Amino acid sequence: MAITVEDRFAITELIAMHGHLCDSGELDRLGEVFTTDVTYDVPDFGQKIVGVTALAEAGRALGERNPVGHHVTNVVLSEQADGHVHARSKGIGIYANGTSGSVTYEDTVVRVENGWRISHRKTLARRAPLGG
């Protein structure tokens, strides 16, 4: 079954919601974005987090080192043979000291009882131009 325009809108909004929840400190609501057993893989920062509760705890542990703004852009969605959706997007993090960083998010998005959720996210730091 092809993903619909409504699905595309819902998934894009889901991806955007992550930044809003993090920036407002509403980490207990991350279950609205991720499955309870999400794998959040951040190899460039040396860790893999499993579970939405552990993800919220990791965010709290970062404390003041968290960005003040998570900005997601350039969302591209493609349906997979198993009905899941692969979502690729760019993230820009703005820190309190005015510096910024760029990442690529590679997400597996699955349909669950209450809508779409991210079941796997790989976050890759972008530190060199032209894919280097």
Predicted regions and their residues:
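Short, low-complexity N-terminal intrinsically disordered segments enriched in polar/charged residues
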Residues: 1-24, 28, 32, 36
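A solvent-exposed, acidic/Ser-Thr-rich amphipathic alpha-helical stretch
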Residues: 27-91
